[in-house]
């Protein structure tokens, strides 16, 4: 078959036109939670491309602009005459109203931010089974002043006259609030009403159908050629390894580069798990001394990241040449990576990057642009939670699927200041105790991340009637849904006490343990 044939994938049932909203990805995730496939595309998508995709429904996202700004983002006005159901959210609703002859007024004292109860004015397919006075999440300045012909007001709030509108004949709808946000009580109900009742989508986007559709597509793309995968042990690369192994078997070679900054026992665990237990070919590359030598005397965190990234590139080049030749490079690129790296450079037909570039390898630096690989990125349209489901369906155990996120530079950026083997050994032991006690307490799966940080100072202590001068360890445990925001975890004091006691008694050169209770924002999850 031709190259074009294997690139033909499932078309999205719902298209999301992105006008710069911070919630565009969230809209897509919420729709996929209804088992309906959706993609985020540029607001500049052409009518021809929309007709080619033939979606069952279109959502116009929110955005930070005012529709009256000189360079405010727009879409082709003909979109409203396609006969395809459209839901405008916040800015998307305001744009629809303005383009169809209504009017929007700038914010004055009636701007709305946060929770607000909506009052339902009349029945509508969009608000079916949504309770009156239910709470919705508002975040807008401008408001609709006058509706276009054919539209009705179906809900309002205390400060917003047109909180929801509809044109039932043309199936055009709008909401001033954000149904995709968790704070909106009946937000998912509104999304389901639009997806199922109005757009008539089928709930056929499942983990099983994704795997069934993807495996033959991988086989068709790769043929009998060899594929190389840089394995990190995280959920993305591990899921990809299982998926590729199921699709092409021995044509896959995984390369695990041990740079010396992994957690205690992880290199041994990964080699045993993939190579011995599941018979997935993994080439182990011990590059510990190379990496630690490059970091000698380096204290700046950005320099550390850059050096680790550059050294990873050199090792990767050397080993791929030694093991190859390989025609394909497999990457665990996810859909948020595609959106964030492409910006507006997204193919409107597929939602994929127009100019494909090899992304940074787990935050440790990009691979060389001149590497002569073709890319295999079967996860590129999935979100993180979907990848976990695929991994589970393929047989990955919970210890991989539910593993806490771990930065590409590893422990090197959890040691503040210069990195050396003594500090690495110290931090590995302390970090293992943190995770061990969190798991014993049954809290591991309830926490986004739990780890230890080694500070580059020494503190005074007393141990065995003797004065000590040793390093302090910081405990960092946070709760989060996606890592974008996070709150410090309220670990019971008895567990914190047990962790601290074990660390100062079992870890050499540590005499103090402190707990970081900073949320994100203003802080970040990692210290470097």
Curated annotation (Swiss-Prot):
It catalyses: XMP + L-glutamine + ATP + H2O = GMP + L-glutamate + AMP + diphosphate + 2 H(+). Its EC number is 6.3.5.2. ATP binds at residues 232-238. Pathway: Purine metabolism; GMP biosynthesis; GMP from XMP (L-Gln route): step 1/1. It comes from the Bacteria. One of its GO terms (cellular component) is cytosol. Residues 13-204 form the Glutamine amidotransferase type-1 domain. CDD domains: GATase1_GMP_Synthase, GMP_synthase_C. This is GMP synthase [glutamine-hydrolyzing]. It comes from Prochlorococcus marinus (strain MIT 9301).
